[in-house]
UniProtKB/Swiss-Prot annotation:
One of its GO terms (biological process) is mRNA processing. This is Pre-mRNA-splicing regulator WTAP. Keywords: Acetylation, Cell cycle, Cytoplasm, Developmental protein, mRNA processing, mRNA splicing, Nucleus, Phosphoprotein. The modification Phosphoserine is found at residues 14, 297, 305-306, 341, 388. Residues 240-396 are annotated as: Disordered. It is found in: Nucleus speckle; Nucleus, Nucleoplasm; Cytoplasm. The modification N-acetylmethionine is found at residue 1. The gene is Wtap. Residues 352-368 have a biased composition (Basic and acidic residues). Component of the WMM complex, a N6-methyltransferase complex composed of a catalytic subcomplex, named MAC, and of an associated subcomplex, named MACOM. The MAC subcomplex is composed of METTL3 and METTL14. The MACOM subcomplex is composed of WTAP, ZC3H13, CBLL1/HAKAI, VIRMA, and, in some cases of RBM15 (RBM15 or RBM15B). Interacts with WT1. Also a component of a MACOM-like complex, named WTAP complex, composed of WTAP, ZC3H13, CBLL1, VIRMA, RBM15, BCLAF1 and THRAP3. Interacts with CPNE4 (via VWFA domain). It comes from the Eukaryota. Belongs to the fl(2)d family. GO terms for cellular component: cytoplasm; nuclear speck; nucleoplasm; nucleus; RNA N6-methyladenosine methyltransferase complex. Associated component of the WMM complex, a complex that mediates N6-methyladenosine (m6A) methylation of RNAs, a modification that plays a role in the efficiency of mRNA splicing and RNA processing. Acts as a key regulator of m6A methylation by promoting m6A methylation of mRNAs at the 3'-UTR. Required for accumulation of METTL3 and METTL14 to nuclear speckle. Acts as a mRNA splicing regulator. Regulates G2/M cell-cycle transition by binding to the 3' UTR of CCNA2, which enhances its stability. Impairs WT1 DNA-binding ability and inhibits expression of WT1 target genes.
């Protein structure tokens, strides 16, 4: 019997019904009653089956809860045991401390008999009496200074107190105002000082930038001078080779004129080296070239010549060195050491060439004396170039 089928009605029969009703009707009522009983039994069985499963689940849950509660109980019992043990330990410690803190009669007697403790108690007693006396005196003074609102002394004292309070407030304002003014003045000074520092820093930055530009210019000038010096040395080496090839016992004036032309070329290169990257006028280059024609030449050791010409050259070079060697060395070295800019190098070289032209004699333009002069002048030129290179290296 399913839950969807309606439950049959319960049949109720009394004793009168049994007596009055017919047999067929009684059988029908009995069948209805049996159907009702069967429906109830089916429902009961269904309920019993559901209740059994639910009871089993609930039983398992209860068992788990019982186990969990038993475990918790054990844990709590252990905690309780530990707490009780701790409490016992605490009680024992408390009893021990009480016993320690409660001195015995013997200890009390020993403390009372101790002279140091007796002295300490006597001092405490004296100080207590002094404080009591001071307290009484202060109370008496306080009671003497008490006054009523109508007393003149109280009014005067209150007025004096108000006046003192006002004076204190005014003094505080003055002090605060003076401090603020001082701080403002210091702040203005600091601002002015910071502005001056800023301006000086800007000037220094501009000066440093200018110095960097000048250093770059000097470096480019030095590079050009080094290149020109290298070219000049190469030309001097070529000139020495030509001189060594051309110097022979059968030399004539024609062969001596060729070195003069080569010396002019060398002097032009030297003047260009001294002038640096600046493009000077042709007249200045000619002037400096004539000056270097008398000075710039190769060293004396690189000139192989005959004995006669060598003696003449050595005599003329000694005479030239004795008369104006110092005048050659100082102007030339000074001229090369003063190469700070293209304009300065051009002016110094022009001045040096004018001095050298004015110091020469017309008789020194001879072939033999010219060779000696070129020898000495080449030494001076090399010394001046080396000194100028050293000076520029120190500048870098």
């Amino acid at each position: 019997m399913t839950n969807e089928e309606p439950l049959p009605k319960k049949v109720r029969l009394s004793e009168t019904d049994f007596k009055v009703m017919a047999r067929d009707e009684l059988i029908l009522r009995w069948k209805q009653y049996e159907a009702y009983v069967q429906a109830l039994e089916g429902k009961y069985t269904d309920l019993n089956s559901n209740d059994v499963t639910g009871l089993r689940e609930s039983e398992e849950k209860l068992k788990q809860q019982q186990q969990e509660s038993a475990r918790r109980e054990n844990i709590l019992v252990m905690r309780l045991a530990t707490k009780e043990q701790e409490m016992q330990e605490c009680t024992t410690q408390i009893q021990y401390l009480k016993q320690v803190q409660q001195p015995s009669v013997a200890q009390l007697r020993s403390t009372m008999v101790d002279p140091a403790i007796n002295l300490f108690f006597l001092k405490m007693k004296g100080e207590l009496e002094q404080t009591k006396d001071k307290l009484e005196q202060a109370q008496n003074e306080l009671s003497a200074w008490k006054f009523t609102p109508d007393s003149q002394t109280g009014k005067k004292l209150m007025a004096k107190c108000r006046m003192l309070i006002q004076e204190n407030q005014e003094l505080g304002r003055q002090l605060s105002q003076g401090r603020i003014a001082q701080l403002e003045a210091e702040l203005a000074l600091q601002k002015k000082y910071s502005e001056e520092l800023k301006s000086s820093q800007d000037e220094l930055n501009d000066f440093i930038i200018q110095l960097d530009e000048e250093v770059e210019g000097m470096q480019s000038t030095i590079l050009v001078l080094q290149q020109q010096l290298k070219e000049t040395r190469q030309q001097l080496a070529q000139y020495q080779q030509q001189q060594s090839q051309a110097s022979a016992p059968s030399t004539s004036r024609t062969t001596s004129s060729e070195p003069v032309d080569q010396a002019e070329v060398t002097s032009k290169d030297c003047s260009r080296l001294a002038n640096g990257p600046s493009n000077g006028s042709s007249s200045r280059q000619r002037t400096s070239g004539s000056g270097f024609h008398r000075e710039g030449s190769t060293p004396e050791d690189d000139f192989p010549s005959s004995s006669g010409n060598g003696n003449k050259a050595s005599n003329s070079s000694e005479e030239r060195t004795g008369r104006g060697g110092s005048s050659y060395i100082n102007p030339l070295s000074a001229g090369y050491e003063s190469v700070d800019s293209p304009t300065g190098s051009e002016n110094s070289l022009t001045h040096h060439s004018n001095d050298t032209d004015s110091s020469h004699d017309p008789q020194e333009e001879k072939a033999v004396s010219g060779k000696g002069n070129r020898t000495v002048g080449s030494r001076h030129v090399q010394n001046g170039l080396d000194s100028s290179v050293n000076v520029q290296g120190a500048v870098l």
